[in-house]
């Protein structure tokens, strides 16, 4: 407390004390004039025991000053009409360039150049929070479908090795690039038909917003900012900006994936 320059009278269960230690976040929540979470759904979630990490009761008491404000993106960098990394620039009035971007992505990562199959992109950390175990359980069934998947990311070593091994077994269907390249991240957003984000929790998320910008349909688990930013597609074909699933299971991911790939093909979008 002396190091912080804070009096010991603040070391109480109602302010900074937490299990005989100092919890600065707790103190911030107590004394802040306003609290911001990066989406309204996540603001609601952190008031529950599942997402509150022991502070849910305190956050609930301070709910009156908690606000959910979505993150924004850099619309100058993430714009298919201005993107310096993609093979062909395009916009909502002329989507022909997206097909050229798909072919360019396929060449870049070594996939066969095919416009008749759905191409699914993933860019993110290969960690539990991002739903990587769901993808790991689903990948074998996905490899039995006529699809292509491009994964870019780094994270837990088991995941890096696991997906690299699968890519070696299915070179015409799955490519896994370990690491991060900004140019390739742009190419994946522009060249993919679908973008996968099966997060266990996601305070806001940015890639689903990039995907909307690039005309790439997000496939997301309905949590946090993913739920707030994506309107679920309905079979009437008139509403929706992407596809949501709710259970944190590979079966739920696969069910929604099969539905949306079939929908893309039936509507002649690939």
Regions found by a protein language model. Name each.
Residues 1-262, 266-267:
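Catalytic cores of nucleotide-sugar-dependent glycosyltransferases that transfer UDP/GDP/TDP-activated
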């Amino acid at each position: 407390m002396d190091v912080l320059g804070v009096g010991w009278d603040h070391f109480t269960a109602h302010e900074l004390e937490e299990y005989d230690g100092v919890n600065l976040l707790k103190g911030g929540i107590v004394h802040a004039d306003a609290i911001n979470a990066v989406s309204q759904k996540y603001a609601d979630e952190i008031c529950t025991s599942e997402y509150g990490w022991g502070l849910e009761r305190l956050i609930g008491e301070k709910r009156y000053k908690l606000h959910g404000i979505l993150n924004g993106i850099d619309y100058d960098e993430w714009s298919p009409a201005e993107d310096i990394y993609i093979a062909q620039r395009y916009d909502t009035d002329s989507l022909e360039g997206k097909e050229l971007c798909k072919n360019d992505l396929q060449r870049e990562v070594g996939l066969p150049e095919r416009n008749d199959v759905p191409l699914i992109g993933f860019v993110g950390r290969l960690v539990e929070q991002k739903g990587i175990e769901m993808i790991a359980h689903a990948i074998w069934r996905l490899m039995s479908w006529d699809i292509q998947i491009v994964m870019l990311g780094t994270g837990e070593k088991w995941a890096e090795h696991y997906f690299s091994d699968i890519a070696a077994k299915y070179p015409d269907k799955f490519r896994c690039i370990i690491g991060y390249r900004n140019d390739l991240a742009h190419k994946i957003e522009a060249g993919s038909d679908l973008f996968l984000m099966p997060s266990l929790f996601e305070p806001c998320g940015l890639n689903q917003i990039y995907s909307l910008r690039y005309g790439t349909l997000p496939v997301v688990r309905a949590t946090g900012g993913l739920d707030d930013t994506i309107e679920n597609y309905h079979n009437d074909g008139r509403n929706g900006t992407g596809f949501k699933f709710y259970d944190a299971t590979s079966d739920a991911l696969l069910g929604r994936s099969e539905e949306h790939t079939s929908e893309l093909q039936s509507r002649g979008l690939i």
